[in-house]
From Swiss-Prot:
InterPro entries: Ribosomal_bS18 (IPR001648), Ribosomal_bS18_CS (IPR018275), Ribosomal_bS18_sf (IPR036870). Part of the 30S ribosomal subunit. Forms a tight heterodimer with protein bS6. It comes from Shewanella sediminis (strain HAW-EB3). It comes from the Bacteria. It holds the Pfam family Ribosomal_S18. HAMAP family: Ribosomal_bS18. This is Small ribosomal subunit protein bS18. One of its GO terms (molecular function) is structural constituent of ribosome. The keyword RNA-binding applies. Gene3D superfamilies: Ribosomal protein S18 (4.10.640.10). Belongs to the bacterial ribosomal protein bS18 family. Binds as a heterodimer with protein bS6 to the central domain of the 16S rRNA, where it helps stabilize the platform of the 30S subunit. GO terms for biological process: translation.
Amino acid sequence: MARYFRRRKFCRFTAEGVTEIDYKDIVTLKNYITESGKIVPSRITGTNAKYQRQLARAIKRARYLSLLPYTDLHQ
């Protein structure tokens, strides 16, 4: 039986040396929300707790300012 090898998750923000996640950086924030608009949990993305809190805050600010949609499921 072959064992499935899962690539080790790492925090992209720690690797790049980011000090603060900017709510105006929509391209980066879109990588951390699902198609339905939910914030992706850190156990999936591998983001550290410190940056996950900053990420959630930045996404919520961007949503409030209409830079990001709350949901994409409008029909």
